[in-house]
């Protein structure tokens, strides 16, 4: 059954972007799913599944972040001490949450407004709870604009999950949290189409990766004021 999903995903990427990217993506999808023992590849149209909140028109399709990009980002973050608490906005089926545990994060939260995706995320991180018993995993099924950021969360992950309206609201919540509890914050943003929102809010880009034209990752930071 998973082989069928790989074919569909390869075709989806090839038709919409390029077949070179499709072959690259499928290679890393198969490698990553096997390496981390996950089931996160299947595409989902959000309009066909149950959504919590009123912001579905600000989102479109569930698609997990490419494993190559994800691992490169976490490898960079490993060099920066103190990054242990991660929030994944639009966590989907929990790929980022699961992989983050392998890179030393001890508190990992995923937020998504699609109930079916949250259930899938719970299933995927369940194995990681056994593998990393000291790591706290929490999947929250809610609209990200309603999420109350924890005072010690310092890494925030995005994979272009929302449009500018939702992203502005989430960035505002992050800034409010940083003012209330001053700390260094890091943004890990794959396919960063709204990167300017963070830069305008005082974040500085520390790392940028671009692969095969379409795969992009930006890591930005903001020091405590």
Where do the language-model regions lie?
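S-adenosyl-L-methionine
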Residues: 1-81, 119-151
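Conserved class I S-adenosyl-L-methionine
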Residues: 83-90
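Glycine-rich SAM-binding Motif I of class I
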Residues: 94-98
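Short beta-strand element of Class I
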Residues: 106-111
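Conserved SAM/SAH-binding beta-strand->alpha-helix loop
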Residues: 114
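A short SAM/SAH-binding and catalytic strip from SAM-dependent methyltransferases
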Residues: 153-165
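C-terminal substrate-binding/active-site "lid" region of AdoMet-derived donor-dependent transferases
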Residues: 165-222
């Amino acid at each position: 059954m998973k082989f069928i999903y790989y074919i569909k995903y390869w075709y989806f990427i090839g038709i919409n972007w390029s077949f070179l990217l499709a072959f690259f993506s499928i290679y890393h999808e198969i490698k990553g799913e096997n390496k981390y023992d996950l089931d996160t590849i299947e595409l989902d149209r959000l309009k066909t599944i149950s959504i919590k909140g009123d912001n579905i028109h600000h989102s479109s399709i569930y698609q997990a972040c490419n494993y190559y990009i994800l691992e490169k980002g976490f490898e960079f973050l490993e060099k920066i001490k103190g990054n242990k608490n991660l929030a994944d906005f639009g966590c989907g089926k929990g790929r980022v949450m699961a992989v983050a545990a392998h890179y030393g994060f001890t508190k990992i939260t995923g937020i998504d407004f699609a109930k079916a995706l949250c259930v899938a995320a719970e299933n995927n991180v369940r194995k990681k709870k056994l593998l990393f018993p000291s790591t706290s995993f929490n999947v929250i099924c809610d609209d990200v604009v309603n999420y109350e950021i924890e005072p010690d969360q310092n890494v925030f992950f995005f994979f272009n999950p929302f449009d500018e309206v939702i992203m502005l609201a989430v960035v505002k919540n992050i800034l409010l949290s940083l003012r209330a509890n001053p700390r260094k914050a890091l943004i890990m943003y794959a396919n960063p189409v709204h990167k300017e929102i963070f830069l305008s809010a005082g974040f500085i880009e520390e790392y940028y990766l671009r692969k095969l034209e379409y795969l992009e990752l930006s890591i930005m930071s903001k020091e405590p004021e």
